[in-house]
């Protein structure tokens, strides 16, 4: 009997691009008449988003926005802020044009500088850092069985995971609500931050139907310098592509907030203003199907002398998503002579996830920031705290998506002699 070989396809995920790159942004802005005039810049906070990332031929084209929120002391001696949107576009060359590419692009603020040219004009310069990753599935043929010519085969079952989706997608959510009666109608917006809860989702016909709830906190300042807080709930729902995903696939969907843009509408003196909120969010989508099949690992012939040639394959195997809360505490000395802590918040400064043999390592830094009264004037302060967590996993971590969120859970202020310290506990 003649030798007959039976082959089966194996799905291999090929990395086309995995780099960090930068895109410069800048703005020369005139303050509108209704903004208080600038006395001194306190802080420029930057949040970034990726609105679209597409592959066109041998190029990856990324469009996004850097949202800059500039805190400053007004000429009246009170804190104020103004928000500027800086759009950007970046094109990155690929080594080849992929078929059915999976695209995941993360954006971070790089260096940024902000200066007041005069009391009504701002100059902003900086760069957005982009981590671009493009992968594409490809097929490789592997021997499943051989017969004839006295062939004897040894086979073993192998898990061959097929990566259905490993990418990010940008989306926008909006909400509107009238402010509470206790807030002055002439209050100005100082800061807006948002957080989004865990997503619930269901796989239906190659789609992932996902829902979550976002909460936006508005910090407003009255004409006498008093701060007010208001919360606004915004539902988030999206239908996400995950071709091939069904109820048996291992899936994960989560949402993170890239930036929050809020505006107050002008109203009559006897009416409360409306708050309009726009959220830029990133949906993190991961879907994988595990299949087990039998493949040849050794063979010999009882009729002929045989030689073997082997080729290594990296087989994927999907595991359940890992969710981990990491408490972080920081005790922060405030500026000398500090009085009342007016406002405080927490934000991610750095984040990274690295896989290895039997573990997943999460590292980064959290920035604790706030405004405090010093000598009757507002001052900005901040403190960086590192975090690190190693999570044991079964096998070697390869393709992965890691999204980070941070939320200020608790704070307490303690006076130690002439020094004020705060202890804050966020998680991610």
Region roles according to the model:
Residues 417-428:
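Positively charged, low-complexity/disordered segments
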């Amino acid at each position: 009997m003649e030798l007959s070989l039976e082959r089966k396809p194996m799905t291999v995920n090929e990395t086309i691009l995995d780099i960090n790159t930068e895109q410069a942004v800048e703005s020369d802005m005139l303050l509108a008449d209704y903004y208080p005039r600038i006395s001194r810049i306190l802080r420029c906070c930057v949040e970034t988003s990726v609105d679209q990332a597409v592959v066109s031929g041998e190029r990856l084209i990324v469009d996004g926005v850097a949202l800059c929120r500039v805190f400053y002391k007004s000429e009246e001696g009170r804190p104020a802020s103004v928000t500027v949107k800086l759009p950007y576009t970046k094109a990155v060359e690929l080594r080849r044009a992929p078929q059915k590419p999976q695209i995941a692009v993360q954006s971070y603020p790089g260096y940024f500088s902000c200066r007041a040219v005069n009391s009504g004009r701002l100059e902003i310069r900086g760069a957005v850092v982009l981590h671009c990753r493009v992968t594409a599935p490809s097929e490789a043929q592997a021997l499943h069985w051989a017969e004839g010519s006295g062939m004897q085969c040894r086979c073993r079952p192998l898990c061959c995971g097929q990566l259905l989706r490993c990418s990010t997608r940008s989306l926008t959510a909006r909400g509107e609500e009238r402010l509470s009666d206790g807030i002055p109608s002439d209050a100005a917006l100082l800061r807006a931050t948002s957080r989004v809860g865990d997503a619930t989702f269901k796989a239906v016909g190659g789609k992932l139907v996902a829902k979550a709830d976002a909460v936006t906190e508005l910090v407003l300042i009255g004409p006498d310098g008093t701060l007010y807080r208001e919360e606004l709930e915004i539902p988030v729902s999206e239908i996400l592509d995950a071709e091939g995903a069904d109820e048996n696939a291992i899936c994960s969907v989560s949402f993170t907030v890239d930036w929050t843009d809020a505006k107050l509408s002008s109203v009559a003196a006897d009416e409360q203003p409306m708050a309009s909120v726009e959220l830029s969010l990133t949906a993190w989508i991961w879907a994988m199907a595990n299949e087990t099949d039998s493949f040849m690992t050794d063979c010999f012939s009882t009729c002929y002398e045989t030689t073997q040639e082997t080729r290594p394959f990296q087989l994927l195997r999907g595991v359940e998503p890992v969710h981990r809360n990491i408490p972080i505490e920081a005790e922060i000395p405030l500026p000398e002579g500090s009085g009342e802590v007016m406002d405080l918040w927490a934000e991610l400064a750095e984040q990274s996830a690295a896989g290895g043999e039997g573990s997943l390592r999460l590292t980064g830094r959290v920035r604790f920031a706030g405004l405090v009264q010093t000598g009757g004037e507002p001052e900005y302060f901040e403190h960086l705290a590192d975090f690190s967590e190693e999570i044991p996993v079964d096998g070697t971590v390869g393709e992965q998506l890691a999204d980070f969120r941070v939320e200020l859970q608790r704070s307490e202020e303690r006076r130690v002699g002439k020094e004020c310290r705060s202890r804050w506990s966020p998680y991610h």
